[in-house]
Every structure is written in C-alpha cells, then in structure tokens.
Amino acid sequence: MCIRDSPYAPWLEDNEKPYYTDKPDWDAFGAMLLVAACRTYEEPVPSTVEKDWIFGEHPLIARLASDEERVWSLLRGATWWLPLADAFFFQAPLPTDDQTMIATLGGLRKELEKLNQLAWQADEDTILGWADTEGYPVDGTLGPDGQYSKADIPEHTQYDTQSLAKFAFSMFWRAMRFAEEQQVPILLDY
C-alpha cells in the first residue's frame, strides 16, 4: 500500500461551477457491465438483453463483481467518483448517513480505458459519438406533416447489448472527461 506524504488539494464546490447531468439508465449501465465481464473472462457477449433485466444477477457480472484480482469500482457499487488522479475506492457515509462506495476519477479512467481496450479499441471521437449514435431503438416515426407518431411501433422488450453498452460507455466517458476538466466529482443519481 502506498501512503501519500501530503493531503489532496480540495476541489471547489459551489453553485457557480458548470455541471454535467447526462446518465445511462439501468439497462444500458448493465449492458456496459456485461460487456466488461464477458470480455474480461473471454466469454461471448449475448446479442441482446431484456428490458428491465436485473443485471447484478447475471453470473458473469456477479463473478467480476466479486473477483478479488480484478477490482472495478463500477462493479463494486461506487456512486461517487472524486476528482483525484490516484486510483482507489472506499466505503463511507454520505451527508444523508447512507453508506456508499466512493471512488476516484483516476480509477474510473483506468476502468473505462481497460473496458475500451478489451471490447472496442475505439478512439475518443468515436467514443464521444456513441451517446448520439448508439443506444435504444427508435420509439416512433416522424410523419410527412412533421408530427411524431408511435403508431405501428411495437414496444421493445429486448435491446442490442453492444449498442446499449457503447451508449452507456460514452456517457460515462463524457462525464469523466467533464469531471476531470472541471475538477468536480461524479455522482450517480438514481
């Protein structure tokens, strides 16, 4: 274990700092974790995931979440990432007295870089674009009159795993970059 000689510099928290508010939903977040688990253990990635699936019950996600040699804050329940370059995480109380796992941006960056290396080897421009080009299927059509319609569009009960994973990954990458540039924490809000 490495002990720092000096404390970390505080970051500024006020209502004047810019903020970033985009986030994936649980289906997309779970798809990203599933791709991470499948690629880590060299297993095939399922082509689809069910709508509202309970991703924590998937055997490969559960295996990676408990793997003592491969520790990812994303799989250990982190909900806060502090703007620190070192990679570590810990459990601590929030101001609400709820306990949460708190990690660092340095650790999140390493995890996201590892996932990209395992799954896609995409450059940053491609990654940033996935939030706009990947994700959920269209839930409606734009008619000739310019009106949006859901007529004749079946409800989706399955989603493309890779597309959802890329969508979530892009949002996490964007949040991480923003947090690094602005020196602000990332907080998952659910």
Where are these regions (language model features)?
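Acidic (Asp/Glu-rich) sequence patches and key acidic residues
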Residues: 4-182, 190
